[in-house]
């Protein structure tokens, strides 16, 4: 994902510079056949785009590019309701020829993935739980909650093209994106399942911990002891032994 600074400095919203303390993120789709986030960013870089006081924090497109138009901690006028004061607003671009676009699935899927990556980064940045109630919502969900105007996005876009995407699925995908490195680290972590597998430098102390019942395996007899856990236990044991000697 590539985030490009494209701040809409001419926009009334940017100039107002009202502080935002992000409590969530709202997902939108632009509602017009325009796949270029750069084009949209330029359009919103005017005092009142289309004669309206509107702006979002960012536009995302299918190739992984994000055009950021407002600082994340500035209120955006993106949903016509109270969520403006609590949520970052992000717009997805849409297929260039609307209903007759030759490859809408590729465009929409790419934009969806870019949005997932951005939302995951923002959730990490602001310590937000993507699965918590009301943290990540679509514009339509915001309306049902009474915090946004009456719009049907982004589900309208997904449903129109039969993509099968849902906001529940989006939240799950953001969560998975945030934790994918955890899974990779866990897979790479060295584990010891038998005392014979424990390195010689720690084996004797590990035996003592097992004999004392401080280190126990599962019901199948496997220790399932990670290298990090082993080092921590050995260091603690040695500190205890040194304290006893003094």
Which stretches of residues belong to each language-model region?
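N-terminal catalytic cores of peptidoglycan-degrading enzymes
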Residues: 1-84
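Basic/polar, cationic surfaces and motifs that engage anionic cell-wall
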Residues: 2-8, 15-19, 95-188
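Solvent-exposed, acidic/flexible segments
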Residues: 20, 83, 104-112, 195-202, ...
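Sec-exported extracytoplasmic/periplasmic mature domains
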Residues: 71, 120-127, 175-179, 210-214, ...
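Short, solvent-exposed alpha-helical surface patches in non-cytosolic proteins
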Residues: 184-246
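Extracytoplasmic/secreted proteins, especially bacterial periplasmic and envelope-associated proteins
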Residues: 54-55, 110-121, 169, 197-204, ...
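Short coil-to-beta-strand
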Residues: 81-93
């Amino acid at each position: 994902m590539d985030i490009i600074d494209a701040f809409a400095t001419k926009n009334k919203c940017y100039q107002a510079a009202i502080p935002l303390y992000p409590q969530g993120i709202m997902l939108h789709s632009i509602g017009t056949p325009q796949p270029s986030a750069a084009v949209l960013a330029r359009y919103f870089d005017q005092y009142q785009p289309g004669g309206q006081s509107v702006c979002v924090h960012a536009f995302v497109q299918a190739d992984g590019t994000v055009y950021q138009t407002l600082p994340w901690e500035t209120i955006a006028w993106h949903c016509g309701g109270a969520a403006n004061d609590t949520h970052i607003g992000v717009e997805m671009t849409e297929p260039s020829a609307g209903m007759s676009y030759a490859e809408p699935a590729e465009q929409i899927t790419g934009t969806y993935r870019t949005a997932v990556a951005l939302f995951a980064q923002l959730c990490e940045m602001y310590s937000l739980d993507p699965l918590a109630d009301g943290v990540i919502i679509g514009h339509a969900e915001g309306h049902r909650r009474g915090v946004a105007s009456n719009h049907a996005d982004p589900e309208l876009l997904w449903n129109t093209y039969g993509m099968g995407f849902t906001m529940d699925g989006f939240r799950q995908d953001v969560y998975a994106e945030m934790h994918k490195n955890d899974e990779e680290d866990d897979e790479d972590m060295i584990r010891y399942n038998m005392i014979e597998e424990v390195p010689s430098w720690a084996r004797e102390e590990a035996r003592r911990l097992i004999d004392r019942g401080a280190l126990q395996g599962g019901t199948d007899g496997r220790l399932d002891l990670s290298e990090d856990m082993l080092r921590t236990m050995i260091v603690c044991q040695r500190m205890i032994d040194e304290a006893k000697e003094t």
